[in-house]
Regions:
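Rossmann-like S-adenosyl-L-methionine
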Residues: 1-149
């Protein structure tokens, strides 16, 4: 989700042994550059680029297919949790959710994420939460690694 020009999917496609990667972005310019990036890096047999809104694409076309979903749009990832959950396999998987938060509110954000997921009749466990970068005094970009069961 929020694949952009492919910074995550290209590296994963080149360095891991996954069978298929779906990279979705709503921005047509990013999508064009993603397609070019896939060609340059010779990962077209692994990465399937999709132009569209993840909120619509995942529940309609990628239902229950993913072992792992990366959500690197810290401004809005929280709004897309339901779509991400619909993409995770019934047997479970991992969601990497990026968010901008006040660092001293980390525990309350974790509780909010867990409640949101559990409201969708899924169980979850926060495997880790890491500050990716500081973006202001007491304000940071954090990635939450969430196991969905």
């Amino acid at each position: 989700m929020f694949g952009g020009v492919g910074p995550f999917c290209i590296i994963i496609g080149k360095k891991s042994s996954v069978d298929k990667i779906f990279s979705i972005d709503i921005n047509p310019d990013a999508y064009k550059l993603l397609v070019k990036n896939i060609q340059i890096n010779k990962v077209g047999d692994i990465i399937n680029p999709i132009l569209g809104d993840s909120k619509n694409i995942v529940p309609s076309s990628l239902l229950g297919l993913a072992d792992r979903i990366i959500m690197p749009l810290p401004e809005n990832s929280f709004e897309y949790i339901e779509a991400a959950l619909s993409g995770i396999k019934n047997s479970g998987g991992i969601i990497h959710l990026y968010s901008h938060i006040y660092i001293d509110e980390l525990d309350s954000k974790i509780n909010l994420i867990m409640k949101r997921i559990e409201s969708q009749d899924k169980s979850c466990k926060i495997l880790s939460s890491n500050i990716v970068k500081n973006i202001g005094p007491g304000w940071g970009q954090v990635v939450f690694d969430i196991q969905i069961k």
